[in-house]
């Protein structure tokens, strides 16, 4: 087998090995988009004049939050927090599961340009 064929086989195997991960990530982001539209958009996509929630277009705001780590973002989104900035637990939708809230956070980070 020549070197080109070997490299092609290796590249194909690597691509196929990653396919389930990409499909899983895509499904998670689709869930996040659905949750965002139903429960998060009213605060996070309305403009700062309406509230102090970070908007999807505000990459700097999201970078600051992402710097705390996803576990902290997930915790704050699930449990809520109060103070100068406040957010109700689960964005005000008690019916959301932890995984749904986490998917919405992941979706918002991706939409804000943060991986």
Q: Where on the chain are the PLM-derived regions?
A:
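Bacterial N-terminal signal peptides that target proteins for export
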Residues: 1-12
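Hydrophobic alpha-helical targeting segments used for export or membrane insertion
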Residues: 10-21
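Electrostatic cytochrome c docking/interface patches
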Residues: 19-35, 50-64
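Axial heme c-ligation environment in periplasmic c-type cytochrome domains
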Residues: 50-51, 76-102, 108-115
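The canonical Cys-X-X-Cys-His
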Residues: 40-47, 104, 108
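Surface-exposed, polar/charged faces of alpha-helical domains
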Residues: 57-64, 68-71, 75, 79
């Amino acid at each position: 087998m020549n070197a080109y064929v070997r490299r092609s086989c290796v590249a194909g195997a690597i691509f196929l090995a990653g396919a389930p991960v990409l499909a899983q990530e895509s499904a998670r982001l689709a869930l996040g988009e659905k949750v965002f539209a139903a429960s998060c958009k009213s605060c996070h996509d309305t403009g700062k004049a309406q509230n102090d929630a970070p908007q999807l277009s505000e990459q700097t705001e999201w970078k600051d939050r992402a710097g705390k780590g996803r576990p902290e973002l997930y915790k704050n989104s699930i449990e809520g927090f109060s103070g100068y900035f406040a957010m109700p637990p689960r964005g005000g939708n008690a019916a959301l599961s932890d995984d749904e809230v986490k998917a919405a956070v992941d979706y918002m980070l991706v939409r804000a340009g943060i991986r």
